[in-house]
From Swiss-Prot:
InterPro entries linked to this entry: aa-tRNA-synth_I_cd-bd (IPR045462), aa-tRNA-synth_I_codon-bd_sub2 (IPR020751), aa-tRNA-synth_I_CS (IPR001412), aa_tRNA-synth_I_cd-bd_sf (IPR008925), Glu-tRNA-ligase_bac/mito (IPR004527), Glu/Gln-tRNA-synth (IPR000924), Glu/Gln-tRNA-synth_Ib_cat-dom (IPR020058), GluQ/Sye (IPR049940)
Organism: Serratia proteamaculans (strain 568)
Obligatory cofactor(s): Zn(2+)
Chief place where the protein resides: cytoplasm
Sequence motif 'KMSKS' region, residues: 237-241
Protein's name in the database: Glutamate--tRNA ligase
Keywords recorded for this protein, A-Z: Aminoacyl-tRNA synthetase, ATP-binding, Cytoplasm, Ligase, Metal-binding, Nucleotide-binding, Protein biosynthesis, Zinc
Motif 'HIGH' region per UniProt: ranges: 9-19
One GO process term, biological-process aspect: glutamyl-tRNA aminoacylation
Keyword Aminoacyl-tRNA synthetase: yes
Function: Catalyzes the attachment of glutamate to tRNA(Glu) in a two-step reaction: glutamate is first activated by ATP to form Glu-AMP and then transferred to the acceptor end of tRNA(Glu).
Superkingdom of the organism of origin: Bacteria
GO terms for MF: ATP binding; glutamate-tRNA ligase activity; tRNA binding; zinc ion binding
């Protein structure tokens, strides 16, 4: 059996984490089986679909590196195909025209609600012999079976059954001639030879209707797998207040795509007790049967932990590629300073996100005229003048600018003055970084560079002289 899956978002908003997880699961299932993955944009809602949303979906998929074999297909470009199938169904009598007015349908709905019944179409036009002309307003409905049931073996939830008596005759073409979502999906899955439909559990009620239409068309019925929803850590449906933002917001906030993918794959799927998965491991181990039926809770702290792990365990060169985007957003020019891969190595332990890292690395590239007020008040006091002058002299005398020689200069200054490293290191840290926190002084001073470090020490000495005056 040829495995072929699809991700079919509606472009009415950003690609959120739930959609991204569904895309990932569909992608992994196809890649695990050596199959194909299709991207399809379900843009039949003409009023709500936007180009911005389409761009956001594409950006999110590309950032996550979820590549596709076919597409992107757009449903709005396939209306002729859908309508041709509907016209065929009218001829085959598996669909019929419904001329019921909005007023009649609304009255029917109100009466059913009053009687405690489930609102559904009563089939008034299903077998009507009333004469109507084609130019009268009408919709086209699918002639759903009235007996029996629809049973499908959900690959996550097991067998699910719906009585056909609970399913009314679905509208498949609107009054304006446009086909409806549920019908377009069926024709697309048929034409694109989709073998497995992996989607959110909110589509479970659509499945029996779509299966009945597929059977009426004589089309093969794909396998279905419905993924549970994602909850916030308070047990409620995930929303913006939980951080349910678009995927690209996670990029903007400094998360690596590898970390987000690792987090999303574990949000409902497991392989033993393993927490960290490379993309290759995900593809090797992923099965639909290992997806949990129950809802999963989104935990930002866990995502941050994973991101910190990836920052420190991925090759620094790869992390630096993503860091470059954040540095650019801050307008930091990196030509006259250390390579970004070295920044990753220097700041990786301290920073949980790349955004934090970009904000923290500015002093490696940009000079400053003022020091952090609290740090300067505490460490750039008159008593710090002698250690700074002494360490400056040793740093200026270095001919081979290496971290080891920088370390020896700082340690040698402390030894000669008979003071602890902190008496030299803390004033030096504030002098060269402008603040009270940084990685180790030897690697920090080395990365900043000899001339720039000496100039900043001179600025600090001038600051101290001002306090002495």
């Amino acid at each position: 059996m040829k495995i072929k899956t699809r991700f079919a978002p509606s472009p009415t908003g950003y690609l959120h984490v739930g959609g991204a997880r569904t895309a990932l699961y569909s992608w992994l299932f196809s890649r695990h089986a050596g199959g194909e993955f299709v991207l399809r944009i379900e843009d039949t809602d003409l009023e709500r679909s936007t180009q911005d949303a389409i761009d956001a979906i594409m950006d999110g998929m590309n950032w996550l590196n979820l590549d596709w074999n076919e597409g992107p297909y757009f449903q709005t470009k396939r209306f002729d195909r859908y309508n041709a199938v509907i016209d065929d169904m009218l001829v085959q009598d598996t669909a019929y025209k419904c001329y019921c007015s909005k007023e009649r349908l609304e009255a029917l709905r109100e009466k059913q609600m009053e009687n405690g019944e489930k609102p559904r179409y009563d089939g008034h036009c299903r077998d009507s012999q009333c004469s109507h002309t084609d130019d009268e307003p009408h919709v086209v409905r699918f002639r759903n079976p009235q007996e029996g049931s629809v049973i499908f073996d959900d690959k996550i939830r097991g067998p699910i059954e719906f009585s056909n008596q609970e399913l009314d005759d679905l509208i498949i073409r609107r009054t304006d001639g446009s086909p409806t979502y549920n019908f377009c999906v069926v024709v697309d899955d048929w034409d694109m030879e989709i073998s497995h439909v992996i989607r959110g559990e909110d589509h479970i009620n659509n499945t029996p209707r779509q299966i009945n239409i597929l059977k009426a068309l004589g089309a093969p019925v794909p396998e279905y797998a419905h993924v549970s929803m994602i909850l916030g850590d308070d047990g409620k449906k995930l929303s913006k207040r939980h951080g349910a933002v678009g995927v690209m917001q996670y990029r903007d906030d400094g998360y690596l795509p590898q970390a987000l993918l690792n987090y999303l794959v574990r949000l409902g799927w497991s392989h033993g007790d393993q927490e960290i998965f490379s993309i290759d491991e995900m593809k090797e181990f992923f099965t639909l049967e290992a997806i949990n039926k129950s809802a999963s809770a989104f935990n930002t702290e866990k995502l941050q932990w994973l991101n910190h792990h990836y920052i420190n365990h991925m090759p620094a060169e790869e992390v630096a590629v993503h860091l470059a985007w954040h540095v650019e957003q801050l307008g930091i020019e990196t030509r006259n300073g250390p390579e970004l891969k070295d920044i990753v190595k220097l700041l990786g332990e301290r920073c949980k996100t790349l955004k934090e890292m970009a904000e923290s690395c500015r002093y490696f590239y940009e000079d400053f005229s003022e020091f952090d007020a609290d740090a300067a008040k505490k460490h750039l006091r008159p008593v710090a003048r002698q250690p700074l002058e002494a360490v400056r002299a040793k740093l200026a005398a270095i001919t081979a600018w290496t971290p080891e020689n920088v370390h020896d200069a700082i340690q040698g200054t402390a030894d000669e003055l008979g003071v602890g490293m902190g008496k030299v290191g803390m004033p030096l840290r504030v002098a060269v970084t402008g603040a009270g926190q940084s990685p180790g002084m030897d690697v920090t001073v080395h990365a900043i560079g000899q001339n720039r470090s000496l100039q900043r020490i001179d600025l600090a000495l001038a600051y101290i002289a001002g306090r002495e005056a």
